[in-house]
Amino acid sequence: MAKNTLIQKILENHIVSGSRTPGEAVSIRIDQTLTQDATGTMAYLELEAMNIDRVKTELSVSYVDHNMMQNGPENRNDHLYLQSVAAAKGVIFSRPGNGICHQVHLERFGVPGKTLLGSDSHTPTNGGIGMMAIGAGGLDVALAMAGQPFRIAYPRIIGVKLTGKLSPWVAAKDIILKMLSILSTKGNVGCMVEYFGPGVAELTVPQRATITNMGAELGVTCSVFPSDERTKEFLEKQGRGESFTALAADADAEYDRVIEIDLGSLEPLAACPSSPDNIKSIKELSGIEVGQVIIGSCTNSSFRDLSIVGAMLKGRKIADNVTLSIAPGSRQVLEMLARNGVLADIISAGARILESGCGPCIGQGQSPANDTVTLRTFNRNFPGRTGTKGDQAYLVSPEVAAAAALTGKITPPSELPFDCPEVAEAEKFLIDDSMMITPPCCGKSVEIIRKKTIGAPPLNSALPDKIDGIALIKTPDKTSTDDIMPAGVHLKHRSNIPEYAKVVFERFNEDGKPTFAQRAVAVRDAGKHGVIIGRDSYGQGSSREHAAICPMYLGVKVLIAISIERIHAANLVNFGIVPFTFADPADYDKIAEGDSIVIENLREKLEKGEYPVEVKAVSADGKVTSIKVNAKLTAEDVKIILAGGRLNCK
């Protein structure tokens, strides 16, 4: 009798090649792709370099949701390029203001049982509708658009059994925060999460999408919910009932690990500064003064989320010490709220309404004041991500955020002088796809608009046989791709690598000393190689491949870390940087910044798979320390690295 999980069923329908053994490489067919503008420009430049006339996927969509501020020509230049290249290559273009890629894709394009690859780490949002939705670097997405399969490690599958029903004031956000308290943000590479059990039927598709969205913070490849009557209801309300397929695991499915959560036992939670897995109950945090509240983002801006906020705010005013901003996830939701009067209630309470886009979640506006607590319904609170150094960002549910806006402090919603509002689900969603531009049947005659701020992807040189390098930096645990390549004010340079590379590791620069970029360029121009030394969970967070491209441009050839997160490790390979891990984690302490790093016969060792590889670290006083490193690379990975990156492979 079959004992397949839902994840195994979807994989089986998409596997092109590889072993079904957990941890071993497997290639899968990709049905749909999505890109957003911050990573999309590079992805489409890479697609152009492949000389593909038209995308080979069932559906590809290019969204503009990140670089919305027109503070200079760069962002609009990107948008013109993206719109024209989408028309040329057969891609649907979602115009600025239409909404955040993950929410809009869930609303208008998500199909149960299909695979989705996106150039954004929160692509797993669409697992809420029963898709296998995976975040990746832009080059991997470009390859998928070109018809190439996507390689992953065959997963270990964590089953999460949901029972019971959420209590008043407890939200879907609290479910995923509970998961983060159990699994943390590290140690889950190579895993996928599958939700099952009677509690699943108690959750709507948008609630499920909140949970799968923040599965990215767990570090898992993706999270998947069954496709059931709730899914059918959602699709029918979106006018897409024909996309429904019932999907579920076999009754006796076997998981590598099972976690059970009684929804009725949960209470409102928060992720405290400055990591999504620093979880405490709202009761523990009660009374902390709050200066800013922002509600929205791709995690928590569904019609239901913002409707309950509107109901809580109706007839009331926000506290004098608080600013409240609303960042709707899609134009669909924003217009529905405007039509039914909820938006007026929110505005009347004192809220500011932002454009439907990523905005403050990526440091694009609404940075908090110094020494100010900010409550956000977002998915990440990495240090400085708000745009304010030393920020104090808490991640909470819309209910908790609205309670704080009213009281001026962190407040358990159950202590408010009114009951939890009963908010009805929308009977039908507003359908208006006029902000989507469908490509012509043949795009060969379309002129691709390429302004001067958009440059071609830089190419790496082949990997040398000997690494004669310098340890340019040592980074702490959980160094994120935000730490490597900051967004915020620098985001507009994503299409201009020479300019963007100037801010690599900007957050670690010290006043009065050469920046990381300056030191890396000096090493590169002296004919040596840059080496980065990292601790645990290096490269967590965003899928931005610029965290590999820009260090590569600066001459970095090798990373040695205690552990490396999945998407970033793949991006390093794609751009010819060797992703090594310490054989003994204690050896991290044996290397100092500025040490010479020597690796002999590297090409031969990688080709033969001779691990561990010996690395010699030579200190300033001439002391030589020998350490051992490993790399989990497939034969294809080695081929790519030896060539200096995938774009060099023929």
Which positions does each model-derived feature cover?
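Fe-S-dependent hydro-lyases/dehydratases of central metabolism
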Residues: M1-K650
